């Protein structure tokens, strides 16, 4: 009795399977490469962030993560993975508090390692142009407190391009009318405090015309 034998795959079928396997391998390789590249970049960014936080805390400052600001007390992400990579890997530092005369220009250099910062409090800090220059790259910044510092008109040039800034406290600083010209482009500014400065009524009026939606306290 003659039995049917399975027919071997045709060359065309083998070729199609080979093409599919090669294509799938290439896709998987690309996904792994992209994923590992992203992971590597984030690990490096978090390393820089941790160094910045250590520098801030060494000067008596404090930082807060985004998940500490809202209703959640811990970051998103599975617990086992947070245990492996750390809670901070799944959060962003959004607030930094560096007040008092222990904070100088060198200490302020740490904020460059916190690119997602939204609130920065520097009341009483001993900062000059070199220190304030570190702030200009914090494009996510929404609230900045420079009260009771030795900030002058010169330093204001370093904050004129912060696109999201909504609150700025310059109380008890050496700011004068000419320096206010640097603030006229801050279209998102809603609160500006100028108490105990040398700013005049004329200076406030000129700035108010440029920023009609901003409340200026003087």
Regions found by a protein language model. Give the residues of each.
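Ser/Thr-centric signal marking residues that sit
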Residues: 21, 104, 125-128, 149-152, ...
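Stable alpha-helical elements in mature extracytoplasmic
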Residues: 48-52, 107, 131, 155, ...
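Leucine-rich solenoid repeat scaffolds
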Residues: 184-218
């Amino acid at each position: 009795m003659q039995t049917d034998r399975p027919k071997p795959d045709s060359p065309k079928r083998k070729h199609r399977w080979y093409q599919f396997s090669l294509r799938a391998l290439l896709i998987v390789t690309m996904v792994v490469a992209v994923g590992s590249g992203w992971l590597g970049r984030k690990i490096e960014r978090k390393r820089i962030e941790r160094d910045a936080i250590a520098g801030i805390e060494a000067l008596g400052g404090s930082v807060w993560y985004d998940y500490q600001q809202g209703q959640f007390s811990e970051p998103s992400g599975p617990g086992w993975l947070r245990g492996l990579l750390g809670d901070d890997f799944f959060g962003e530092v959004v607030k930094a508090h560096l007040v008092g005369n222990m904070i100088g220009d060198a200490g302020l250099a740490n904020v460059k390692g916190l690119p997602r910062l939204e609130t920065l409090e520097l009341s009483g800090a001993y900062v000059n142009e070199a220190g304030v220059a570190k702030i200009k790259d914090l494009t996510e910044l929404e609230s900045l407190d420079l009260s009771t510092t030795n900030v002058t008109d010169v330093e204001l040039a370093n904050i004129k391009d912060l696109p999201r800034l909504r609150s700025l406290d310059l109380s008890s600083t050496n700011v004068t009318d000419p320096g206010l010209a640097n603030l006229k482009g801050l279209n998102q500014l809603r609160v500006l405090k100028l108490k105990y400065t040398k700013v005049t009524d004329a200076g406030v009026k000129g700035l108010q015309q440029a920023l009609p939606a901003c409340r200026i306290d003087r």
